[in-house]
């Protein structure tokens, strides 16, 4: 059954306006979600332009088909139900060799967080799931109940940056020996019980970072983003642009590093000119990340941690 998507798009105008949209261009929304970015991008295209929209969540596609109906009727939209790590292969299958621009809105969409049964939220009691793609096999239940102590510590440190990772992993190990940990609230309580009392008084939910780390592991979010962004930069036409919105430091560091590698080059000393194969492919459109306005911060709480980075293709 299709559930309504109630999703406030973050950095809507900045993300699309920075793509410098050509009316007859070929564009990609790598993270369809609530379709806010797609809708605004389509409003800038002529009927000769086309948008390819990726999402691995069928619920997002079903809702977008309603929201974008006027553009679908004109043949301006193609939906691709897949992980964006397969971006290049799926676009090539569709006959696309080059794109004029692409946008990413990384992280979990509000509707996924709000659907209790998806198991993303520590605030709502639900089975441990956290799959963005409901057809995927690995769930949060598997991670929490079957990963060994060392693997749990690794993902809690690496993806959650939680300094109490060892204590939390040990507590999970103890609890699951008694009985399986089955729900989000069970896990949240175990995490709380593993932390010192003074930590529980700090701002923010004590389970937030651990839930984030499990979600990233279940969906291989950073691995997928790394592969996809590199493919996107390869597929950009000259002067094409890429916009990436991130919501936590791990995503932002990854995006910053990928853009840096593509926009800088180490040239051997003494070369009178830079050979074509050494020239950087990209240039940064803005040196620093673009942040939400004061108005947006007030209107949309989700936007507080958002950062937008944009780069442009300057060399094939």
Curated annotation (Swiss-Prot):
Its main location: cytoplasm. Keywords: Cytoplasm, Methyltransferase, rRNA processing, S-adenosyl-L-methionine, Transferase. It catalyses: cytidine(1402) in 16S rRNA + S-adenosyl-L-methionine = N(4)-methylcytidine(1402) in 16S rRNA + S-adenosyl-L-homocysteine + H(+). Its EC number is 2.1.1.199. GO terms for biological process: rRNA base methylation. Pfam families: Methyltransf_5 (PF01795). It comes from the Bacteria. One of its GO terms (molecular function) is rRNA (cytosine-N4-)-methyltransferase activity. GO terms for cellular component: cytoplasm. PANTHER family: 12S RRNA N4-METHYLCYTIDINE METHYLTRANSFERASE, S-ADENOSYL-METHYLTRANSFERASE MRAW. Belongs to the methyltransferase superfamily. RsmH family. This is Ribosomal RNA small subunit methyltransferase H. It comes from Streptococcus pneumoniae (strain Hungary19A-6). The lineage of its organism: Bacteria, Bacillati, Bacillota, Bacilli, Lactobacillales. The gene is rsmH.
């Amino acid at each position: 059954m299709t559930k309504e998507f109630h999703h406030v798009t973050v950095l809507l105008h900045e993300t699309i306006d920075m793509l410098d949209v050509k009316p007859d261009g070929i564009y990609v929304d790598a993270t369809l979600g609530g379709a806010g970015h797609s809708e605004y991008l389509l409003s800038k295209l002529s009927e000769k332009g086309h948008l390819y929209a990726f999402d691995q969540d069928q619920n997002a596609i079903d809702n977008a088909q309603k929201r974008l109906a006027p553009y679908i009727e004109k043949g301006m939209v193609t939906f691709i139900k897949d992980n964006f790590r397969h971006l290049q292969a799926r676009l090539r299958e569709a006959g696309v060799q080059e794109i004029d621009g692409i946008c990413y809105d990384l992280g979990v969409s509000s509707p996924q967080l709000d659907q209790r049964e998806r198991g993303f939220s520590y605030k709502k009691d639900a089975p441990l799931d956290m799959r963005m793609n409901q057809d995927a096999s690995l769930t949060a239940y598997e991670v929490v109940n079957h990963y060994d102590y060392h693997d749990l510590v690794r993902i809690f440190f690496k993806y959650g940056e939680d300094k109490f990772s060892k204590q939390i992993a040990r507590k999970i190990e103890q609890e699951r020996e008694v009985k399986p940990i089955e729900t989000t609230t069970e896990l949240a309580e175990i995490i709380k019980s593993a932390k010192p009392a003074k930590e529980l008084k700090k701002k923010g939910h004590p389970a937030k970072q651990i839930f984030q780390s499990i979600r990233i592991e279940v969906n291989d979010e950073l691995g997928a983003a790394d592969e996809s962004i590199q493919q996107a930069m390869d597929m950009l036409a000259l002067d094409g642009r890429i916009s990436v919105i991130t919501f936590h430091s791990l995503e932002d560091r990854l995006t910053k590093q990928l853009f840096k590698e593509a926009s800088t080059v180490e040239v051997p000393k003494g070369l009178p000119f830079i050979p074509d194969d050494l020239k950087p492919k990209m240039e940064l459109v803005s040196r620093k990340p673009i942040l939400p306005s004061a108005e947006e911060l007030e209107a949309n709480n989700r936007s507080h941690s958002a950062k937008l980075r944009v780069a442009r293709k300057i060399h094939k």
